[in-house]
Amino acid sequence: MLCFQCEQTHSGTGCVIRGVCTKTPEVAAIQDLMIFASAGLSYVAKKLPDSCEAERKEAASLVIQALFSTVTNVNFDADVLTKALYHLVDFRDALKAKLPEDVELPLAATLDFSRDRETLVKQGESYGIASRQKTLGIDVTGLQELLTYGMKGMAAYAHHAAVLDYRDPDVDNFLLEGMAALTDHSLDIQALLAVVMRCGEASYKTLALLDKANTSSFGHPVPTNVKMGPSKGKAILVSGHDLLDMKELLEQTKDTGIKVYTHGEMLPAHGYPELNKYPHLAGHYGGAWMLQRQEFINFPGPIVMTTNCLMEPRKEYAGRVFTRDLVGWPGLTHLPDRDFSKVIEAALESEGFTEDQESRSHIAGFGHHTVLDSADAVVSAIKKGDIKHFMLVGGCDGIKSGRHYFTDIAEKAPKDWVILTLGCGKFRVTDLDLGKIGDLPRLLDMGQCNDSYSAIRVALALAEAFDTDVNSLPLSLVLSWYEQKAVCVLLALLHLGVKGIRLGPTLPAFITPNMLKILVDNFDIKPIGNSAEEDLQEILAAKAA
């Protein structure tokens, strides 16, 4: 196996024996084949006659589900993934009967996928990253992976929107186009870069789509005090990103006496009016995803994993974990739909918290709607000099010690700077008491990783107010990355022409030196420095210049 799609990949170069995420070579091979089959299906779907629009839409749905299933820490169940792979292939083959006779097909559209698991895994090894590096070179393969990971992130966000009945034909069409491009080995670096930039455009549309889906379904987030700890009583913990799962669980637990807590990136749920209206949405438990193996042991009730990030469960709590939708781990109880009766039964049978715990509070819900409602006051504060700078510190969190940099840079920023945060990277700064500038908190939690759209909307609005461009604003972006949704967000920012992004804690292993030179030359992307102090001095010097 060779997998280097996440920031924690082994030695910063790639996992070759077993994933740092605990993904096995078997699962890695099947996931590689899911990408290969998705590319073949996408090619076929793009060649269908105009009369086959329904089939093309279904193909996009299957590709979205397949891509999301291969995102880091989503599904580790080889049986489930194999079944999904065969479904892709069977649908691909059914669609080929609708093609004109003169259509030439690439190998990904014709390959006969073995129905024997051992042989199937060997096939996966033949069409994975390592084999393409040998035949296409590291730069072309690296760009293919950059494109693939951007589309994986897109697929995750598009899937969340789709479960709320929101689709965008432009998003679907690009996913088919982008995946089909992976079958064309004649594309050189410049041609692939062009597709990657189109992926950035489609990524931005996907972020906008999910924002519309969430706010139309649950209302615009509003600033909300969230208790960051538990209270006495029976309890259910919900992790992941799926707000519809949260809504349905809250509805089904009404009047049961059970308290529902958010975990990880579900924290922003508290800011949505249609979720916060439930009084038994009692607070938040724990920190970022990578702490779950310690935190879940001490949670006295069932745990629902709605999306990533799932880690290998410890035996002490594995029997209390329920997976939903595309999430999977062998042996865990999977819920095929939003009937949470088993979870509720488990909560009622569990001890629950025996006493209230003293805990701090955190204000969530500073989405773009709330911030832009105060735009005049913000612009006035900038003009008066009360606010000198904005700095976005957020993204994905992870376990590396170097990530304390993100805490340091927020804590040591000048007192007249506003800190924007989002994603699970927020847990690097939520413990900080940064105070206020006038009536505005210096720390504004804008939501989940997909709520990068809110940060972009605010930046674009400020640029318009000052009759300038985003790169001329008093704004710095310091992004932490971990998995493929962060790649989607990064490509969206590059599509908008945003420059000078600091990325860390390390640069992606799939970015080759030649690719990095292109990103630096065109977008001034830079790795985070040796220390927060050094980078702050560099930012201040650039402001003064």
Swiss-Prot record:
Keywords: 4Fe-4S, Cytoplasm, Iron, Iron-sulfur, Metal-binding, Oxidoreductase. It comes from Zymomonas mobilis subsp. mobilis (strain ATCC 31821 / ZM4 / CP4). This is Hydroxylamine reductase. Belongs to the HCP family. It holds the Pfam family Prismane. It is found in: Cytoplasm. It comes from the Bacteria. HAMAP family: Hydroxylam_reduct (MF_00069). Its EC number is 1.7.99.1. One of its GO terms (biological process) is response to hydrogen peroxide. Catalyzes the reduction of hydroxylamine to form NH(3) and H(2)O. It is an enzyme of class 1 (oxidoreductase). Binds 1 [4Fe-4S] cluster. GO terms for molecular function: 4 iron, 4 sulfur cluster binding; hydroxylamine reductase activity; metal ion binding; peroxidase activity. The keyword Cell wall biogenesis/degradation does not apply. The lineage of its organism: Bacteria, Pseudomonadati, Pseudomonadota, Alphaproteobacteria, Sphingomonadales. The keyword Nucleotidyltransferase does not apply.
